Amino acid sequence: MCIRDSPLIQDYDGRADGILRAVVYRLWSEGFRFFLSGMACGFDLAAAEAVLALRGECAGMELVAVVPFAGQPESFSDADKRRYADVLTAADRTVVLADSYSRGCYYRRNDYLVDHAVRVVAWYIRRNSGTGYTVRRARHQGIEVLNLYEDKMNPTLF
């Protein structure tokens, strides 16, 4: 399972944290054990934190941090840098896809997430975004996408 958000930090403000935790727990109860996070600010980090919070009570649950390039958090706020570092330190595994930033590195990260996912959980608002690309690619490959933005705005998931 992979976790993705729309790239603008203000898109995700924590309003679905409760649903997010419930979804992660439900996926674990369905047999999912490996949760991949793209490590972007916002929903990616919130989802990673939900996995870490549940890991103690969910046997076998693991967080895989998928980092597009070393130095990803350099442009983050100080608070987000600390949050990122905490998640990265606590992750069970880290996959760093490139030594430095290059054009297309975020798409390669998104491709990696989809290529290693059976299901995608996203906070998807805008079609023209990295998350939009990820969602379209997942759906094209027949991978189920749970869009918590839609579920939060029209709560029929639970």
Regions found by a protein language model. Give the residues of each.
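Short, small-residue-biased leader/transition segments that mark boundaries at the very start
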Residues: M1-I3
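Acidic/glycine-enriched connector segments
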Residues: D5-F158
